[in-house]
């Protein structure tokens, strides 16, 4: 349980990955800084959720190759 994310987290993550595909990697800390730089997020919690989802998607993308 707990792995279902809100729609705005998913849509923001997909938009960021579409616009900036080479900016993100599988490191959460680096992704957190990039999300804060590239997106206007209201709270630290939302920023961390987006960065975590970006990290998860990038890690799974690396495993698929």
Curated annotation (Swiss-Prot):
GO CC, any one term: ribonucleoprotein complex
GO MF: structural constituent of ribosome
Disulfide bonds: none
Entry's Gene Ontology BP terms: translation
Record Pfam families: Ribosomal_S17e
UniProt entry tagged with the keyword Ribonucleoprotein: yes
Gene3D superfamilies in UniProt: Ribosomal protein S17e-like
Keyword Hydrolase: no
HAMAP family registered for this protein in UniProt: Ribosomal_eS17
Homology family: Belongs to the eukaryotic ribosomal protein eS17 family.
Protein name (database record): Small ribosomal subunit protein eS17
Organism of this sequence: Methanocella arvoryzae (strain DSM 22066 / NBRC 105507 / MRE50)
Lineage per the UniProt record: Archaea, Methanobacteriati, Methanobacteriota, Stenosarchaea group, Methanomicrobia
Gene symbol of the encoding locus: rps17e
């Amino acid at each position: 349980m707990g792995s279902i994310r809100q729609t705005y987290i998913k849509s923001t993550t997909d938009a960021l990955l579409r616009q900036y595909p080479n900016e993100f990697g599988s490191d959460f800390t680096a992704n957190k800084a990039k999300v804060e730089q590239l997106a206007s997020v209201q709270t630290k919690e939302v920023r961390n959720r987006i960065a975590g989802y970006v990290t998860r998607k990038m890690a799974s993308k690396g495993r698929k190759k």
